Amino acid sequence: MNLQTKLINNNMNKTFADIRVGDILYWGAIDMDHVATTIVTDTHLNLDGEHSPKVCDVTFKTNDGFEFDICNCYINIHNCIIFTHEINGNDIYIGTTKEAVAKNILKTLNSRISFWANRKERFIKRYNEED
């Protein structure tokens, strides 16, 4: 069993605080045309005394040059999470499967398309009413 299969199949209740070096994660962004694979090469937990030990900040330093800081990570890693990357301000989607990441990106794209389509319709309606 490879590491990817092990991570997906055996960690149903794992949180980001449980991620270890060598784990495979997937990530993507709205402005990317693919979902990237990354292997965690370093993790750093910042446990906050005000929270339970399972709520923490995690920094992932990956082999492809990215560093992710995720705060308050009490989350099932099968639910793709969204956070803003501090360097470029883009929303980054990260999860344990390509499918989870892709679905969340598509969901956001669809909601944005719907938002702008609705706004366009309202604008056209108001514009026509003014005539």
Which stretches of residues belong to each language-model region?
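Solvent-exposed strand-loop boundary residues in beta-sheet-rich modules
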Residues: 30-31, 64
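Short, solvent-exposed secondary-structure boundary/capping segments
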Residues: 45-59
